[in-house]
Amino acid sequence: MKIVICSGGFDPIHSGHIAYFRSAKRLGDTLVVGVNSDAWLTRKKSKPFMNFNERFEIVQSIKYVDYVMSFNDDDDSAILLIDNVKKAWPQDEIIFANGGDRNTSNNREAEVKGVTFAFGVGGSHKMNSSSEILKSWNN
């Protein structure tokens, strides 16, 4: 079986995230989405717009998503998430799906052995941006 991993803050979730999940699901049999903690969002952009429980529940309700996991890597990577998925599905092929804004030069997760990495999932460019949505909302 092929297990596909997506990760992100999803704060707020938008159409680009849905395209990411849809495309990622096509890569395998099971889609696992890691939702970053509020602490991670605070480090990245000062505070969450939506709290973790809201983001988790919304992601969990999306039809392409089979499992949702929480995670908080102190190094701002998704390496801990990947390790947890590898432990949960030790016999299966693991694919880490990267969105359009990621590549090999800005992907610390590529250090993890035994994982296939897919880039440009959901499109080769970023369709939408949570930060841009919030910026326009604040203005």
Q: Language-model features: where?
A:
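Nucleotidyltransferase catalytic core that binds NTPs
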Residues: 1-139
